[in-house]
Amino acid sequence: MYNGGVATNDTWIVIAAYREAAVIESVVREVTAGGWSVVVVDDGSPDDTASRARAGGATVLRHAINLGQGAALQTGIDLAVRRGARNIVTFDADGQHAAGDIPALVAALADADIALGSRFQGSVDGASRSRMALLRAAVWTSNRLSGMKLTDAHCGLRAFRASAVPALRITQDRMAHASELLRKIKASGLRVVEVPVTVRYTEHSRAKGQSGFQAIRILFDYFFRTS
C-alpha cells in the first residue's frame, strides 16, 4: 500500500502512551487509516489506554509500571525492528500530531538517516503567544547546548531509518530522551533533515503537556548532568 507516494508496508509508527484512554483510539485510527502499522506502548497506565489503543487497530505492549516516555519509545522501537521495519516514526499519543505529515517524513529518509518534524517550518494550532515564545527559547537553548542548528528542539514527530537505531538507542527513560537524541545525532554524524509538520494544541494536550519552562529545565539537566 502507498500513502502520498510512499510505501507503508516497511514503516512502523511508535506511540508511547500514558493515561490516554480519552483520545488514543481516535489517534490510532487516524494513523492506521493511512495504511501504517502502529505499535502503542502503554507505559503503566491505570486507565483503559491499552484496550482503547487495541480497539483502534494498534499492536499493544504494556509496561507493568510507569517507566517514562523515553523507555516506552525504546520498547516500541525494539518491536518495530523485530518486525522488520525499514523506517520508524515516533508519534505523540495526545492528538498533537497529524497523520497526514507522516508520508513527507518517511519520504525525506531517501536522502537522510533521520527526519525531524519542525512546527516552526510548518504550523502550530492552538498555542498561546507565551507558549510559542517559550518554545522558541527552548530551540535557542537546545541549539546552544547541542551544537546543532535546528528550527525545532523537541518535536516528538520524527522518522528515522532502522539502520540508525543502534546509534540512537534511548537510555534516558523520561523526557530528557529528546535532548539525548539530539546529542547522539550530532555525535554519530547521521544525516538529518527537518520537515514541516503541524502541531495541534488541544485542550487535552495542553492539560497533559509540559510547559516551556519545564522543557528548558530538562535541556539544562540533561546536557549538564551528562557532560
Language model feature labels by segment:
Residues 22-26, 47-56:
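Acidic helix N-cap motif at the loop->helix transition within catalytic regions
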Residues 65-82, 99-175, 201-227:
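Acceptor/aglycone-binding surface of glycosyltransferases and processive sugar-polymer synthases
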Residues 42-51, 95:
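A conserved acidic beta->alpha catalytic loop
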Residues 1-30:
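N-proximal low-complexity "stem/linker" segments adjacent to membrane-targeting elements
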Residues 149, 170-173, 182-200:
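Catalytic donor-sugar/metal-binding loop of nucleotide-sugar-dependent glycosyltransferases
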Residues 15, 27-28, 36-45, 61, ...:
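Short beta-strand/loop segment that forms part of the nucleotide-sugar
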Residues 10-12, 37, 180:
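Cell-envelope/extracellular polymer assembly enzymes that use nucleotide-activated donors
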Residues 85-96:
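Short beta-strand-to-loop acidic/aromatic patch adjacent to the donor-nucleotide binding site
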